Amino acid sequence: MATSLRITGLVKEYRAGKPVLNGIDLDIAGQGLTAIIGPSGTGKSTLLRCINRLIEPTSGEIVLKDAEGTVDLARVRGQSLRRARRRIGMVFQEYNLVERLTVMENLLTGRLGYTSALNAWMRRFDPADIERAFQLLDTVGLAGFADQRADALSGGQRQRVGIARALMQRPQLLLADEPTSSLDPKTSVEIMKLLTEQGSVNGIPVLVNIHDVELARRYANRIVGMSGGHVVYDGDGKGLDATMLKTIYGGESWLE
């Protein structure tokens, strides 16, 4: 069953009467990479963090439908929320690795949602999970790095570990919050290519918040433009002409 995500009337206010997200409506269905672009402060990261409930939405619906069932992520609580989060992989801008742990140990944290507290504390993981972790290290180009500490890796290597860790969850939906912002241009291309490939291989939608419009055009089959907490564009890269980019970014100086 193909994964679908339907966001309806999503509002997030950090202060009453000042919404960061102001009535977001968005449907994501099937595999493919969707890029979210827009100026800083327009709510791109807030949107992704609402989807996987790192922050609480103020109102609205976030309905995830996949092979495991249907759940409104905006309303679910307790153990049901923990189970729902297992279905969503997250790749972070600043990697969010445990620096003192090895690459392998960081990957295995992606299975904590499926592991008892005692086994997690004792670092006892299913042999099948360990085998999959080695396979994913090969997939992301880090074969032979299993025993290296995370704090010894470059930024690009850390982001590859972050992607592999997210894939360890066997997610039905993959979110990536500014995955290339701290990387050089060559590595940024490699990371976007990897995200696109893994979305296709695993048959899941990938939702990426990104500042680089050209990377979005190159790798996304769909681009969502946000401005002022609203969706102002939803289409492919061909529709992102100078007029639309001015609508999204509120000026032309960025083009110079």
Curated annotation (Swiss-Prot):
The complex is composed of two ATP-binding proteins (PhnC), two transmembrane proteins (PhnE) and a solute-binding protein (PhnD). The keyword Signal does not apply. The keyword Plastid does not apply. Keywords: ATP-binding, Cell inner membrane, Cell membrane, Membrane, Nucleotide-binding, Phosphonate transport, Translocase, Transport. Part of the ABC transporter complex PhnCDE involved in phosphonates import. Responsible for energy coupling to the transport system. The lineage of its organism: Bacteria, Pseudomonadati, Pseudomonadota, Betaproteobacteria, Burkholderiales. PROSITE patterns: ABC_TRANSPORTER_1, ABC_TRANSPORTER_2, PHNC. ATP binds at G38, P39, S40, G41, T42, G43, K44, S45. It is a peripheral membrane protein. Residues 5-253 form the ABC transporter domain. One of its GO terms (cellular component) is plasma membrane. One of its GO terms (molecular function) is ATP hydrolysis activity. It is found in: Cell inner membrane. Belongs to the ABC transporter superfamily. Phosphonates importer (TC 3.A.1.9.1) family. InterPro entries: AAA+_ATPase, ABC_transporter-like_ATP-bd, ABC_transporter-like_CS, ABC_transpr_PhnC, MetN_ABC_transporter-like, P-loop_NTPase. It comes from Bordetella parapertussis (strain 12822 / ATCC BAA-587 / NCTC 13253). This is Phosphonates import ATP-binding protein PhnC. It comes from the Bacteria. It catalyses: phosphonate(out) + ATP + H2O = phosphonate(in) + ADP + phosphate + H(+). Its EC number is 7.3.2.2.
